[in-house]
Amino acid sequence: MGFFLCSSSSIFFKFGISIIFLVSFSGLTPSEAYDPLDPSGNITVKWDIITWTGDGYVATVTVYNFQQYRHIQAPGWTLGWSWAKREVIWGMNGGQTTEQGDCSKFKGTIPHCCKKTPSVVDLLPGSPYNQQIANCCRGGVLNSWAQDPATAVSAFQLTVGQAGTTNKTVRVPKNFTLKAPGPGYTCSPAKIVKPTRFIGTDKRRVTQALMTWNVTCTYSQFLAQKTPTCCVSLSSFYNKTIVSCPTCSCGCRNTSQPGNCVDPKGPRIASVIPNPGKNAYIPPLVQCTKHMCPVRIHWHVKVNYKQYWRVKVTITNFNYNMNYSQWNLVVQHPNFDNLTQTFSFNYKPLTPYASINDTGILWGIKFYNDLLMQAGPFGNVQSELLFQKEASAFTFEKGWAFPRRIYFNGDNCVMPPPDSYPWLPNTGSHKSVGSLFAAMALLLIVFLHGNL
């Protein structure tokens, strides 16, 4: 009998560890390249050949951010590819390559880039007018499609030499890559499509590209970073419990080797403020917390009215190395179909499945709170949401008032476990009794095991 108890307890222990391991990593899988809240979201690169030249062609390359709520912030996108033959870039407008490469074999006019694998970036605002084209020169920053389609497009023009001069002799580039600004995007092979049609400014004449191909790039949070980037905490007026972000949501504090986070009261705080003129990707340097996340979203159920209920949403930045410009928040909750008012955020419903309206995107008001400042006294933005009650569904029981899912800047945030949500007082007692019975059962098993 004793052997049976020992063996079974060992099996249950191993089984429990296995379940915990699987649950811990279930949130970060390669399948996250498909986003159920934005199933058709992608970045599409369209390459239009506009005219032929003596040894190649002139093309306009347009980058469309068709993602509803994932934008590209500074220092912006970097687009790369491999030439199929020995092509060179003679000149560019609206963008530039990051390296020229070895052009020593050329005499006279030197190409803009001779690399087999060029990387192109957008020009910065304020670039000379003779180097600009339409939709260029925003430093590679692209807004999300839901926030502002007009600024979700970027373009550059390049003159390609040592290439084909007909549709049959041109070879499409291969191995496209997109950094925005870091990793996370996987690009498809270029696909030749029907030539793009252009409508004239007077809308009376239509021209078309000589040849067009498209590249589609999709995002995976699993590829973008090893750990999550945000977490969610919860509270309510009907329960004193404040549910914090789960411990180690975005990594654990390294106590043996200090330096992976900053104590806000420590002497090092003044030295970590980044140089605002540095136009390069800077990894997060976060405030020392139990959750170790760069960003925390707090959802507080604030007031219960007769026909309405109110929520306060606070976004706090714990990252000393990042100001989040044009930030956005996506929230999934069944009562969004009855959202009545947002007090200091912009709001737009997201309905990837037309019959279901349970998801909304929130973002800051321009020049007021569209910039989430770096960690510190000004590193937060907040708003309140007013929902109308739906008699058939509304309840404060069993955590119904809390969101099902939250995204910050397109990344899925770590939610607290459902059994930790603030419960109504009359149901909290049942939870306590259940926990008491579980503890008593565990003590009984230990007692029996010790006496057998």
UniProtKB/Swiss-Prot annotation:
GO terms for cellular component: plasma membrane; side of membrane. Expressed in roots, stems, leaves, flowers and siliques. GO terms for biological process: cellulose microfibril organization. InterPro entries: COB_C, COBRA_pln. It comes from the Eukaryota. Residues 1-33 form the signal peptide. Glycans are attached at N42, N167, N175, N214, N239, N254, N323, N338, N357. Residues 433-452 form a propeptide. Keywords: Cell membrane, Glycoprotein, GPI-anchor, Lipoprotein, Membrane, Signal. The keyword Cell membrane applies. It is a lipid-anchor; GPI-anchor. This is COBRA-like protein 1.
